[in-house]
């Protein structure tokens, strides 16, 4: 039988719109924009609930996950959150972390993907403790339950370190308490395209500098060749 540990006292440590199951289960699920949190819990998940924003919403989720070392799998299921692109932001955070200065999630395509209330050690713990299971845009109950049970069968046991407790400013319900304005899908798409354009401009600039250097080298070579030819011609005439 795999080893289990006690979650933080009073777990879950952050209030939210979720359902709690067996705290010793190795599985947690975020249902993103969908309210189907009962499905994972019925299949044996420790906790399940929506996560609608790519900043404070993710921070609250992480605080509840790393404060229970028994949770080793995070299933991303339900409809992706339009504009915020929360599911993809969670994957990017787990894979890439955040920029140490700007605190933005590296590689996230959401509108405001910033993690300001979770320190680096909390993000690192999230990355090490959890394995991400991608079922984004899947709402089929049978598929979700099957994946929960599959993860339970692969339970590696509790994470080697004890529960990590991080305080996150709650500010009420996620939809109302976060200082995040709803972002239309069109706006998020424009912002994502702007970021892509900026990247392409930087690449073009680098390419231009490279070709400029090559051109400068060619001109320099031609001038040296002409000077050598003229010098040789003068010497022959003399």
From Swiss-Prot:
Cofactor: 5-hydroxybenzimidazolylcob(I)amide
InterPro entries: MeTrfase_MtrA/MtxA, MtrA
Entries under Pfam families matching the protein: MtrA (PF04208)
Oligomer and partners: The complex is composed of 8 subunits; MtrA, MtrB, MtrC, MtrD, MtrE, MtrF, MtrG and MtrH.
Molecular function GO labels: cobalt ion binding; tetrahydromethanopterin S-methyltransferase activity
Protein name: Tetrahydromethanopterin S-methyltransferase subunit A 1
Pathway: One-carbon metabolism; methanogenesis from CO(2); methyl-coenzyme M from 5,10-methylene-5,6,7,8-tetrahydromethanopterin: step 2/2
Transmembrane segments: 219-237
Binding site for 5-hydroxybenzimidazolylcob(I)amide: 84
Species this protein is from: Methanothermobacter marburgensis (strain ATCC BAA-927 / DSM 2133 / JCM 14651 / NBRC 100331 / OCM 82 / Marburg)
EC number(s) given by UniProt: 7.2.1.4
UniProt membrane topology term: Single-pass membrane protein
Record's signal peptide: none
């Amino acid at each position: 039988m795999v080893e289990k540990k006690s979650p933080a006292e009073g777990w879950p440590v952050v209030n939210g719109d979720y359902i709690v199951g067996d705290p010793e289960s190795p599985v947690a699920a975020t249902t993103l924009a969908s309210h189907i949190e009962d499905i994972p819990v019925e299949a044996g998940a420790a906790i399940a609930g929506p996560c609608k924003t790519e900043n404070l919403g993710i921070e609250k989720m992480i605080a509840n996950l790393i404060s229970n070392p028994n949770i080793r799998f995070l299933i991303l299921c339900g409809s992706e959150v339009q504009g915020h692109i929360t599911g993809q932001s969670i994957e990017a955070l787990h894979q890439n972390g955040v920029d140490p200065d700007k605190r933005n999630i590296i590689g996230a395509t959401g509108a405001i993907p910033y993690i300001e209330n979770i320190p680096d050690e909390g993000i690192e713990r999230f990355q090490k403790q959890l394995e991400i299971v991608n079922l984004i845009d899947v709402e089929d109950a049978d598929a979700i339950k099957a994946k929960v049970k599959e993860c339970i069968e692969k339970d590696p046991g509790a994470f080697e370190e004890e529960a990590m407790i991080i305080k996150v400013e709650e500010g009420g319900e996620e939809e109302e308490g976060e200082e995040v304005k709803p972002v239309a899908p069109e706006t998020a798409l424009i912002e994502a395209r702007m970021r892509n354009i900026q990247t392409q401009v930087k690449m073009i600039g680098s390419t231009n500098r490279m070709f400029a250097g090559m051109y400068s080298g060619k001109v320099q070579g031609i001038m040296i060749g002409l000077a050598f030819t003229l010098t040789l011609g003068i010497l022959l005439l003399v």
